[in-house]
């Protein structure tokens, strides 16, 4: 028995040794197994509007669970606030929020990148969670939110957590809402279109320009891009200082609702602020970049306003057509009455009718327009019979030796003798063949058509590209609209700015019709060999008038193209034709009394091209570069002197290397050797005043260096044109010439229209000289028909003013149509 017991103990010894070994501790039969931890235990019991504090580290994380019930047709938005005193960017506090359809995460401190590798840290972060809306089909929904707070810090990082429900998350129509945002605490709100509203305007204002902010409109989808580095990823957006406005249409949002997102940028350079920010060590940015904002969503105009405004634009300018028809009908009745009374029909004995022909009310283009009959003070000149001159003037039987010496006709045909006479008359400067001169001036018309086609086609292509980029990217900082009065239509963002340019096209075409009528009447007079069309009045050349009409129409087309997307890159689209219009008007004024010595079309358009090129250089380099202004001012002064010399000497003063020697001789003989009055006093007065004006412009530009170089150049052209026109009218009255009622009315209308137009032009509703946000500070509401703004009225009035200006040039010398050309003075 004892042996059996020993044998049993010997068999159990290996098992006892194994159980007692250190690598395999013996299990206590009384110790229960360790319970598994429920990962949601720490999240249970979390409440809204309660601040939770804690410490997280490498081995500890806290999970909070929040639940609420969303009712149908009610949107409940939740906002999470997290604050951490830790500034250690290597071990930030990590926040992960899990919802039914979205996971949102961020770190505290929140890091933002700026220019030149600068970084900004924010220890207080709050984000709005993407809301889930219950529907009538689903009924009330139980929403569950988990907030996971963790950190990889070995020693722990403290934090504070607050989760709240937003009471004012949905914006209402015509109700202003005030709130505060910062770079680490962006805000966004929901807006739903009412059933009776198809378009709205989001208006955002702030009393403080900085910090720079971004307003974005995004479709209803999660996640919402509400941080500086991703706000541009979705929707429509624009930068903002004090004002922002975005026009939206219901048809662009399938759910008929959208989010309005407000983001504060960490730096202000995008809004025109400083590129450099003084940063101190251990400086917190939480309180330095807060901005108070006010948002209001108002209904935009209805479709009926589009129709009413379009009809207004058409009818207001069609009334000019009716007015011209009425004036033409009155002239026709007066002509018929005079014909019945027998006021026509007296004969001068040469077979030509001497009558107050209706051509006196038009602008004829004379055949051999420089010639007069044999009683002229310039004998010896002949007119070809084909040009309407009196027949029977054949060559004499003089011997061939007469060509060996100068006769009186040879002397009178010498330009240097004729154009340097003290008293010049129109017959002295209208000696060239009518057909040659007519073809010369028609080149202006054909050249400007060619320029317009080649200029407009790439312009249209470019602005279409700009508009496409705006529509695709949603970046409304590309174009400088007046966003408070920018009414979209189709793919166009500001249809009202385009529609208002219709006046240039319609009035330009009307001016072409008026010129064409005068041209036809004149040709009929030439065919009838009317002596008044041949030897009386100002020689008429319609080429420049046709060119002016085309230029006015193209100004409207290119201005409309510019306003498709006005910005720094396409300002010269319409200003180019403004320069050409001003230049053509000055050429026409000069050509009126100097028909034989006007500039050729090629040199004139080449000069305009140089001006446009200089303008582009001025816009690019003229802002801060003093050297550009020094060079430009010197060229401006020298060009004024050279042009003045050519005008004073009627083109007989050669500009070459010997100009300085000749100028010194003239100065010595006329000013030092004997001080004599100028030979051409009237011209001298005009040129002295003109040079003073141009030198003043040059000095002003050199001292102040205006940023808007394009407007500065346009001001030079307009001032010179007005100065020349005023001189022309004064000299006309001084020469005992009359101003008929029609041109007098046009002069008064021109002055009134230009004064009103310039008032609206200087309202400055936007400007591409600054940033888009700075430009929006100047935006204003519509003032006409709730559709047109101040700049649109400028378009209306400037088109009308240009039309009347052209009529002034067309009709100013109608009183001379019954005056012989050898009695019309040149000035």
Swiss-Prot record:
<feature type="transmembrane region" description="Helical">
    <location>
        <begin position="573"/>
        <end position="590"/>
    </location>
</feature>
<keyword id="KW-0472">Membrane</keyword>
<dbReference type="GO" id="GO:0015485">
    <property type="term" value="F:cholesterol binding"/>
</dbReference>
<feature type="transmembrane region" description="Helical">
    <location>
        <begin position="792"/>
        <end position="812"/>
    </location>
</feature>
<dbReference type="InterPro" id="IPR025958">
    <property type="entry name" value="SID1_TM_fam"/>
</dbReference>
<feature type="topological domain" description="Extracellular">
    <location>
        <begin position="705"/>
        <end position="710"/>
    </location>
</feature>
<feature type="topological domain" description="Extracellular">
    <location>
        <begin position="563"/>
        <end position="572"/>
    </location>
</feature>
<feature type="glycosylation site" description="N-linked (GlcNAc...) asparagine">
    <location>
        <position position="136"/>
    </location>
</feature>
<feature type="transmembrane region" description="Helical">
    <location>
        <begin position="495"/>
        <end position="515"/>
    </location>
</feature>
<feature type="topological domain" description="Cytoplasmic">
    <location>
        <begin position="516"/>
        <end position="541"/>
    </location>
</feature>
<keyword id="KW-0732">Signal</keyword>
<feature type="transmembrane region" description="Helical">
    <location>
        <begin position="601"/>
        <end position="621"/>
    </location>
</feature>
<feature type="glycosylation site" description="N-linked (GlcNAc...) asparagine">
    <location>
        <position position="567"/>
    </location>
</feature>
<feature type="transmembrane region" description="Helical">
    <location>
        <begin position="684"/>
        <end position="704"/>
    </location>
</feature>
<feature type="glycosylation site" description="N-linked (GlcNAc...) asparagine">
    <location>
        <position position="764"/>
    </location>
</feature>
<comment type="similarity">
    <text>Belongs to the SID1 family.</text>
</comment>
<feature type="region of interest" description="Disordered">
    <location>
        <begin position="355"/>
        <end position="408"/>
    </location>
</feature>
<dbReference type="GO" id="GO:0003725">
    <property type="term" value="F:double-stranded RNA binding"/>
</dbReference>
<feature type="topological domain" description="Cytoplasmic">
    <location>
        <begin position="648"/>
        <end position="683"/>
    </location>
</feature>
<feature type="glycosylation site" description="N-linked (GlcNAc...) asparagine">
    <location>
        <position position="471"/>
    </location>
</feature>
<dbReference type="GO" id="GO:0050658">
    <property type="term" value="P:RNA transport"/>
</dbReference>
<feature type="topological domain" description="Extracellular">
    <location>
        <begin position="763"/>
        <end position="791"/>
    </location>
</feature>
<comment type="function">
    <text>In vitro binds long double-stranded RNA (dsRNA) (500 and 700 base pairs), but not dsRNA shorter than 300 bp. Not involved in RNA autophagy, a process in which RNA is directly imported into lysosomes in an ATP-dependent manner, and degraded.</text>
</comment>
<dbReference type="GO" id="GO:0051033">
    <property type="term" value="F:RNA transmembrane transporter activity"/>
</dbReference>
<feature type="transmembrane region" description="Helical">
    <location>
        <begin position="310"/>
        <end position="330"/>
    </location>
</feature>
<keyword id="KW-0694">RNA-binding</keyword>
<feature type="topological domain" description="Cytoplasmic">
    <location>
        <begin position="732"/>
        <end position="741"/>
    </location>
</feature>
<feature type="compositionally biased region" description="Acidic residues">
    <location>
        <begin position="398"/>
        <end position="408"/>
    </location>
</feature>
<feature type="signal peptide">
    <location>
        <begin position="1"/>
        <end position="19"/>
    </location>
</feature>
<feature type="transmembrane region" description="Helical">
    <location>
        <begin position="711"/>
        <end position="731"/>
    </location>
</feature>
<dbReference type="GO" id="GO:0005764">
    <property type="term" value="C:lysosome"/>
</dbReference>
<feature type="glycosylation site" description="N-linked (GlcNAc...) asparagine">
    <location>
        <position position="57"/>
    </location>
</feature>
<feature type="topological domain" description="Cytoplasmic">
    <location>
        <begin position="331"/>
        <end position="442"/>
    </location>
</feature>
<feature type="topological domain" description="Extracellular">
    <location>
        <begin position="20"/>
        <end position="309"/>
    </location>
</feature>
<feature type="compositionally biased region" description="Polar residues">
    <location>
        <begin position="364"/>
        <end position="374"/>
    </location>
</feature>
<keyword id="KW-0812">Transmembrane</keyword>
<dbReference type="Pfam" id="PF13965">
    <property type="entry name" value="SID-1_RNA_chan"/>
</dbReference>
<feature type="topological domain" description="Cytoplasmic">
    <location>
        <begin position="813"/>
        <end position="827"/>
    </location>
</feature>
<keyword id="KW-0325">Glycoprotein</keyword>
<feature type="topological domain" description="Extracellular">
    <location>
        <begin position="622"/>
        <end position="626"/>
    </location>
</feature>
<feature type="transmembrane region" description="Helical">
    <location>
        <begin position="627"/>
        <end position="647"/>
    </location>
</feature>
<feature type="transmembrane region" description="Helical">
    <location>
        <begin position="542"/>
        <end position="562"/>
    </location>
</feature>
């Amino acid at each position: 028995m004892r042996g059996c017991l020993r044998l049993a103990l010997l068999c159990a010894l290996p098992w006892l040794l194994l159980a007692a070994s250190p690598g395999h501790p013996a299990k206590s039969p009384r110790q229960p197994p360790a319970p598994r931890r429920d990962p949601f235990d720490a999240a249970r019991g979390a409440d809204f509007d309660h601040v939770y504090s804690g410490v997280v580290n490498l081995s500890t994380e806290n999970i909070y669970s929040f639940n609420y019930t969303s009712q149908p047709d009610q949107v409940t938005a939740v906002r999470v606030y997290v604050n951490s005193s830790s500034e250690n960017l290597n071990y930030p506090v990590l926040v992960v929020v899990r919802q039914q359809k979205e996971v949102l995460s961020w770190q505290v401190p929140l890091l933002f990148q700026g220019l030149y590798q600068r970084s900004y840290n924010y220890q207080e972060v709050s984000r709005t969670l993407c809301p889930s809306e219950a529907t009538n089909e689903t009924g009330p929904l139980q929403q569950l939110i988990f907030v996971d707070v963790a950190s990889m810090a070995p020693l722990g990082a403290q934090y504070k957590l607050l989760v709240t429900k937003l009471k004012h998350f949905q914006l209402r129509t015509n109700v202003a809402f005030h709130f505060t945002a910062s770079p680490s605490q962006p805000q966004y709100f929901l807006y739903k279109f009412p059933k009776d509203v198809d378009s709205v305007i989001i208006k955002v204002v702030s009393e403080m320009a900085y910090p720079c902010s971004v307003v974005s409109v995004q479709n209803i989808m999660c996640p919402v891009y509400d941080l500086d580095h991703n706000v541009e990823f979705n929707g429509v957006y624009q930068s903002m200082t004090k004002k922002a406005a975005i026009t939206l249409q219901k048809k662009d949002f399938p759910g008929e609702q959208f989010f309005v997102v407000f983001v504060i940028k960490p730096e202000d350079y995008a809004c025109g602020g400083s590129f450099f920010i003084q940063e101190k060590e251990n400086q917190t940015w939480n309180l330095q970049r807060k901005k108070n904002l006010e948002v209001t969503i108002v209904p935009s105009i209805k479709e009926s306003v589009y129709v009413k405004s379009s009809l207004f634009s058409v009818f207001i300018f069609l009334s000019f057509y009716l007015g011209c028809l009425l004036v033409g009908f009155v002239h026709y009745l007066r002509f018929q009455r005079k014909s019945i009374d027998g006021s026509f029909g007296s004969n001068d004995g040469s077979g030509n009718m001497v009558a107050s022909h209706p051509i006196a009310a038009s602008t004829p283009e004379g055949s051999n327009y420089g010639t007069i009959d044999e009683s002229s003070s310039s004998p010896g000149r002949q007119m070809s019979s084909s040009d309407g001159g009196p027949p029977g003037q054949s060559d004499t039987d003089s011997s061939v030796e007469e060509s060996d010496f100068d006769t009186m006709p040879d002397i009178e045909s010498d330009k240097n003798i004729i154009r340097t006479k003290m008293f010049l008359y129109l017959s002295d400067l209208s000696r060239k063949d009518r057909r040659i001169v007519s073809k010369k001036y028609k080149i202006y018309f054909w050249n400007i058509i060619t320029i317009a086609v080649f200029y407009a086609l790439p312009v249209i292509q470019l602005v279409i590209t700009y508009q496409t980029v705006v529509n695709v990217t949603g970046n409304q900082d590309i174009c400088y609209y007046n966003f408070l009065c920018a009414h979209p239509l189709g793919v166009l963002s500001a249809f009202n700015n385009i529609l208002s340019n219709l006046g240039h096209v319609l009035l330009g075409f009307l001016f072409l019709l008026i010129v064409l009528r005068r041209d036809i009447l004149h040709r009929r007079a030439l065919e009838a060999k009317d002596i008044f069309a041949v030897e009386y009045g100002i020689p008429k050349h319609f080429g420049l008038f046709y060119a002016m009409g085309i230029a006015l129409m193209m100004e409207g087309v290119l201005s409309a193209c510019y306003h498709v997307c006005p910005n720094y890159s396409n300002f010269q689209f319409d200003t180019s034709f403004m320069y050409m219009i001003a230049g053509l008007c000055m050429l026409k004024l000069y050509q009126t009394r100097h028909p034989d010595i006007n500039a050729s079309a090629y040199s004139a358009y080449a000069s305009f091209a140089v001006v446009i090129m200089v303008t582009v250089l001025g816009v690019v380099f003229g802002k801060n570069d003093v050297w550009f202004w020094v060079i430009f001012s010197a060229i401006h002064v020298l060009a004024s002197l050279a042009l003045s010399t050519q005008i004073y000497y009627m083109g007989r003063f050669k500009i070459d290397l010997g100009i300085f020697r000749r100028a010194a001789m003239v100065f010595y003989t006329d000013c030092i050797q004997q001080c004599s009055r100028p030979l051409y006093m009237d011209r001298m007065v005009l040129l002295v005043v003109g040079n003073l004006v141009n030198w003043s412009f040059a000095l002003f530009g050199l001292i102040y260096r205006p940023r808007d170089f394009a407007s500065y150049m346009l001001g030079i052209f307009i001032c010179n044109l007005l100065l020349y026109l005023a001189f022309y009218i004064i000299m006309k009255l001084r020469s005992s010439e009359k101003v008929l009622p029609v041109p007098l009315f046009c002069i008064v209308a021109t002055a009134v229209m230009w004064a009103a137009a310039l008032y609206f032009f200087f309202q400055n509703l936007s400007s591409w000289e600054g940033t888009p946000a700075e430009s929006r500070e100047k935006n204003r509401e519509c003032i006409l028909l709730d559709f047109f703004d101040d700049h649109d009225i400028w378009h209306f009035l400037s088109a009308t003013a240009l039309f009347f200006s052209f009529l002034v040039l067309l009709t100013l010398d109608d009183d001379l149509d019954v005056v012989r050309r050898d009695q019309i003075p040149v000035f």
